[in-house]
Structures are given as structure tokens and as C-alpha cells.
């Protein structure tokens, strides 16, 4: 199961699991080249990307940049090395 499927499962699985999720992405230039996105900042789960509200603007992040997905403090998906 890839990151898109995991995020959709969190979104449609009931409750507010996607809103409580933390998604770590590859973000060149950020400390450690990583950035954490809160589930509450996800505006849309598209076919090849997620649309996210960032402090500056809305941005499109391709799923292949996702490194890890956490839900309720547990890692539910991690990119293989």
C-alpha cells in the first residue's frame, strides 16, 4: 500500500484520523531536508499529489516525496530505504 492509499484510508475510515495525522516529506532546504505537514493542512488528495496549505500559499506535493505518515502517534507508513 502506498502513501496515497494510506492517506485515503485515514480520510475515509471514519473519525478525524487524517486531521490528526503528521506527514513527513522531503523538503530540500529545510532543516534535515524534511518538513512535517499536519493533517489539518491537507486540502485535497489528488491522483498524483496532495494539495496543502502552507504558511506562504497552497502547494502541490507529489506523493513520492512523502517519507513517513503517523496517525495517533503511530507510524502507519514509511518509505522503504
Specify the residue positions occupied by each region the protein language model found:
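Short, compact, well-ordered microdomains
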Residues: 53-81
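N-terminal recruitment modules of adaptor/scaffold proteins
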Residues: 1-57
Amino acid at each position: 500500500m502506498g502513501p496515497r492509499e494510506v492517506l485515503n484510508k485515514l480520510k475515509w475510515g471514519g473519525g478525524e484520523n487524517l486531521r490528526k495525522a503528521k506527514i513527513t516529506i522531503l523538503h530540500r532546504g529545510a532543516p534535515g531536508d524534511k518538513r512535517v505537514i499536519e493533517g489539518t493542512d491537507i486540502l485535497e488528495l489528488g491522483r498524483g499529489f496532495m494539495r496543502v496549505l502552507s504558511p506562504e500559499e497552497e502547494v502541490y506535493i507529489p506523493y513520492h516525496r512523502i517519507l513517513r505518515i503517523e496517525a495517533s502517534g503511530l507510524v502507519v507508513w514509511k518509505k522503504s530505504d
